[in-house]
Swiss-Prot record:
GO terms for biological process: fatty acid biosynthetic process; malonyl-CoA biosynthetic process. A zinc finger (C4-type) spans 27-49. It comes from Chlorobium luteolum (strain DSM 273 / BCRC 81028 / 2530). This is Acetyl-coenzyme A carboxylase carboxyl transferase subunit beta. InterPro entries: AcCoA_carboxyl_beta (IPR034733), Acetyl_CoA_COase_Trfase_b_su (IPR000438), ClpP/crotonase-like_dom_sf (IPR029045), COA_CT_N (IPR011762), Znf-ACC (IPR041010). Residues 23-281 form the CoA carboxyltransferase N-terminal domain. The gene is accD.
Length: 281
């Protein structure tokens, strides 16, 4: 007869609960774990260190337009393939796959509406579409946004979030630098303000063209802004770069950025600034 039975020790666990994917996000700067609801309430900024997460054009529209009401325009434009470009896949296939995967149609979206009760036109770039690169469609959309601002007699805000020119379109992409810069001069001729908002990243042909041409150049905190990347520059000149090189704060210190604004204060600061810049009559 067995009086005792040896039982192997074990740890009793509670029933496993599946956590929905995407419920938590980790801050890239401080490592804090942020709940999705908390992140949205803070306009996709970290409440611990102030890090600004990248957001879509629609998110900027909802932040800046009154009651999240706006009208999008020129969403029908699609990229052509003038060079029949092929890298690891054909350019049209890459565009099609990106549209299917992301649900976005291009790296730029245009909208107009009311902000603080006044008419406003916004052209916002999207890093989530082929790195926010500027091809012929992006250049055309920004140009049409300037035309819409003139039509509505309203200020224009261009929100940059891009790695630069779209290499798949070659010279057609580089032409957009001159095209957008030329079109934006018409705003000045019509005495309409143009505000450039640079977010992370604003690089390459974007920083070398319209992003630095604003009547007021604004940036989000710690945004990477420059032409070539810091690693490329370091490898070229064979020297260490200053601390914070190509960050918004460094550029403001050296006179390239007029104002750094936290996303929570963006609408209020823009409203005050545009009110002062508004020309009557």
């Amino acid at each position: 007869m067995v009086w005792f039975k040896r039982v192997k020790p074990f740890i009793r666990t509670t029933d496993r609960r599946d956590v929905p994917e995407g419920l938590w996000s980790k801050c890239e700067d401080c490592g804090a774990m942020l709940h999705r609801r908390q992140l949205e309430e803070n306009l996709n900024t970290c409440n611990e260190c102030g890090h600004h997460f990248r957001i879509s054009p629609y998110r900027y529209f909802s932040i800046l337009f009154d009651n999240e009401e706006f009208t999008e325009f020129d969403d029908c434009l699609r990229a052509a393939d003038p060079l029949t470009f092929v890298d690891t896949k054909k350019y049209p296939d890459r565009v099609h796959d990106t549209i299917e995967k992301s649900g976005k149609t291009e790296a730029c979206r245009n909208a107009f509406g009311k902000s603080a009760g006044a008419d406003l036109v916004i052209s916002a770039m999207d890093f989530g579409f082929i790195g926010g690169s500027m091809g012929s469609v992006v250049g055309e959309k920004i140009s049409r946004a300037a035309d819409k601002a003139i039509e509505l007699n309203a200020p224009l805000i261009v929100i940059s979030q891009s790695g630069g020119a779209r290499m798949m379109e070659g010279a057609f992409s580089l032409m957009q630098m001159a095209k957008t810069a030329a079109r934006l001069t018409r705003l000045g001729e019509n005495r309409l303000p143009f505000i450039s908002l640079m977010t992370d990243p604003t690089m390459g042909g974007i920083s070398a063209s319209f992003a630095m041409l604003g009547d007021l150049n604004i940036s989000e905190p710690k945004a990477l802004i420059g032409f070539a990347g810091p690693r490329v520059i370091r490898d070229t000149i064979k020297r260490d770069l200053p601390e914070g090189f190509q960050r918004a704060e460094f550029l403001q210190e050296h006179g390239f950025v007029d104002m750094i604004v936290h996303r929570k204060e963006l609408k209020q600061r823009l409203a005050k600034t545009l009110a002062m810049m508004r020309v009557e009559g």
